[in-house]
């Protein structure tokens, strides 16, 4: 979004997220009760990219998004206003379980999302871990937060990053071979 100059709106989803959180609701502002548009309506009006982060943490309280995911206008029941999506409006979502829930105990807060809801996302990408070289570049980009550039010690930032990605690769391969129950991410 930054490279394209596009507005980006992120909504962190949790089990309590509902229509009021997403579309908006009545709020007391300066002593008056007014309808305040939520992040979804703002994104629709501005043609923004809307990220529904960790959508598999949601419950059926998010079904108000079904028509929106199809690119249709939405009737705001609380005001009677119809909001049409502006050009460029897109919705993306992240989910550790692709909305299928987690039986292995790794994502205990993940919910099973209604299949009809999931089908409204026309593209699904299974994000793999980056290659060792890419992951090392990611770590080096953020290394100064953890190791000052003038620090002295047993490892240079480059050596530490290489050791971390090598260790992560061993952990991941062991995980995929069912040797351990946990895996590490780049985070």
Language-model segments: residues:
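C-terminal regulatory/interaction module of P-loop NTP-utilizing enzymes
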Residues: 1-187
């Amino acid at each position: 979004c930054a490279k394209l100059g596009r507005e980006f709106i992120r909504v962190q989803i949790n089990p309590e997220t509902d229509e009021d959180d997403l579309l908006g609701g009545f709020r007391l502002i300066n002593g008056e009760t007014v309808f305040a548009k939520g992040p979804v309506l703002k994104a629709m009006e501005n043609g923004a990219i809307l990220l529904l982060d960790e959508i598999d943490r949601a419950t059926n309280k998010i079904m108000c998004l079904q028509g929106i995911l199809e690119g249709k206008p939405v009737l705001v029941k609380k005001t009677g206003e119809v909001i049409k999506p502006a050009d460029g409006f897109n919705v993306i979502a992240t989910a550790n379980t692709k909305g299928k829930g987690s039986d292995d105990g790794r994502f205990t807060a993940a919910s099973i999302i209604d299949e009809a809801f999931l089908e409204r996302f026309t593209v699904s990408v299974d994000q793999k871990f980056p290659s060792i070289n890419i992951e090392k570049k990611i770590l080096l980009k953020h290394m100064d937060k953890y190791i000052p550039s003038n620090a002295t010690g047993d490892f240079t930032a480059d050596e530490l990053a290489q050791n971390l990605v090598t260790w992560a690769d061993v952990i991941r391969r062991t995980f995929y071979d069912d040797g351990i129950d946990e895996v590490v991410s780049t985070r």
